[in-house]
Amino acid sequence: MSKEIPYKIYLEESEIPTSWYNVRSDMKIKPAPLLNPGTGQPLSLEELSPIFCEELCKQELDNDTAFFPIPDEIVKFYKMYRPSPLVRAYFLEEALGTPAKIYYKFEGNNTSGSHKLNSAIAQAYYAKKQGLKGVTTETGAGQWGTALSMACAYFGLDCKVYMVKISYEQKPFRREVMRVYGADVTASPSDTTEVGRKILEQFPGTTGSLGCAISEAVEVAVKNEGYRYVLGSVLNQVLLHQSIIGLETKAALDKYGIKPDTIIGCAGGGSNLGGLIAPFMGEKLRGEADYDIIAVEPASCPSFTRGKFAYDFCDTGMICPLAKMYTLGSGFIPSANHAGGLRFHGMSTILSQLYHDGYMRAVSAKQSEVFEAAELFAKCEGTLPAPESSHAIKAAIDEALKCKETGEEKTIVFGLTGTGYFDLKGYQQYNDGDLTDYIPTDEELEKGFAGLPNVEA
């Protein structure tokens, strides 16, 4: 006899995962190594150490260890907001009239409003353990910067945040939350760094990009003793920490004997998607199960769907290591009209390799469609979703409507990465009819590709 599925499935505190899962351990073809931009050779632990914390460098380079124990102090912090609920979207299902069963993993139940805290607290912990004075980082919409400022406040670390200029101006309240937690927040590009001044000279009036903010944060970290750079997405270590999302999701589904057919996540740099799909992808890689895994990205920043699989810089200033990923070119800057987040030009090397090898697929969505889906979800499910999360909502709705046509009773799981209460400018533009769907032309993309470094893949 099947159990009745509650609206929210909660794990017990004692069921919080005590190890992170490293999906690379099950990948037959490993992600290509990070390269030293000067020599073109794979980066060593010693070369990475001036940029990242020592323990995080080890996590970054380890392709073989399947599980990393989560330190007790991090588990203790996780208990403030974890386990997060897995929610059955009964009201959305009813509104769509679909036979599909829809679930979402809600990661917005903390002050940062998103999943970003899962990795922020881990990276701050290792920085504190190493005896560092502080860390530097970039942030786009502000969720990562907020999460890191919280984590740094908890461990008594300095936190310097370079925030993409367009978001700095559009989201002043997110900036203020960071300042509440003691962070020093600077609009990027800025005149406080060498690379920032260079970009301002090259592109007067630019609204910035994540690639630009990364360059500034890295420069400050390497030039100031006692500081290291930390990143909220893209890196292997970040996807490792975020695996807690997928591990909890799978544990909650297993409690009720539920096997998903489709797993959907929004994709900018890949932290949420990589974390959500981790244990399911592991099963797929080991041949134990099969899932339809879908990455959803903005049509205005289409790394997977229109990008190239090549070595590229992770930053606009071209000072970071080279990563083999799906990329639009490190010089690509999304339109200032793009309100939906997910503005990074590249993608996680892990997800890039998995996509290249056919283990997952990708779709893109126009931001007007994304906000339409977001408002339907808000009306049905009672939570105002972040624009980033709403890309996954859009794809989940599309898949559910396909089931309505075919009569299939598929089980769909997606990641609700966070809340949209600081993203009301985008909602305002949508409701006022001022939101435009910017889609880069082939010619614009070719300009970005022309700047790709000449590296033997």
Segments (PLM) and residue ranges:
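Alpha-helix C-terminal capping segments
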Residues: A122-L132, T146-D158, R179-V180, I277-G287, ...
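Active-site/ligand-binding loops adjacent to catalytic centers
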Residues: F67-P69, I199-Q237, I245, G257, ...
